[in-house]
């Protein structure tokens, strides 16, 4: 996995996500039962909306359900004063968490970086009195969720675990020690004699 190599190089999962993805913050508005976020035209390149988008300040619908919007339309809305928008929870479905969200003290009570949002996940987060989510910005043009799903599925969490995993692939059957695994890893990628 690509994330295993980056972990072995000393990055943690949060640093990897921050390096490759920008984030967007959504806050639950209990009065409207919608999610509020800043309107950034950069995030709206050739996008079809399955749900309506509401101006948080005026309460007016600014993007209708089924409407297609591109960067120029989005820029025009921003120039007309659109700053914050309200969206339904359904518009968050299929988006990915930018950081871990802890909903209780148990190990299983954490939604990890890269978790895809759906009705159940959002409801469990709201039931835990968490009203703000950081979502990684992805799109179908040039920023797919591939690394996010890789990070979510990577069982390694530390540099040592990742180096040991790489060692097991390079030398299957040999019992790894972290010292030997680190030496092999460093010789493989950082040896001046080799490169």
Protein language model features and the residues they cover:
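N-terminal non-catalytic structural scaffold regions of very large proteins
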Residues: 1-195
């Amino acid at each position: 996995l690509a994330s295993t190599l980056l972990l072995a190089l000393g990055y943690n999962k949060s640093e990897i996500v921050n390096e490759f993805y920008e984030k967007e913050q959504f806050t639950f508005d209990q009065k409207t039962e919608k999610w509020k976020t800043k309107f950034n035209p950069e995030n709206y390149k050739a996008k079809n909306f399955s749900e309506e988008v509401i101006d948080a300040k005026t309460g007016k619908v600014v993007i209708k359900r089924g409407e297609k919007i591109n960067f120029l339309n989005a820029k025009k809305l921003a120039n007309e004063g659109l700053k914050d928008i309200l969206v339904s929870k359904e518009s968050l479905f299929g988006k990915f968490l930018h950081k871990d969200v802890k909903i209780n003290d148990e190990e299983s009570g954490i939604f990890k970086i890269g978790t895809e949002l759906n009705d159940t996940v959002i409801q469990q987060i709201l039931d835990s009195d968490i009203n703000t989510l950081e979502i990684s910005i992805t799109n179908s043009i040039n920023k797919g969720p591939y690394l996010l799903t890789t990070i979510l599925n990577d069982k390694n969490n530390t540099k040592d675990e990742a180096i040991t995993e790489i060692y097991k692939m390079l030398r299957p059957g040999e019992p790894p020690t972290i010292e030997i695994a680190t030496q092999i890893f460093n010789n493989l990628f950082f040896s001046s004699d080799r490169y």
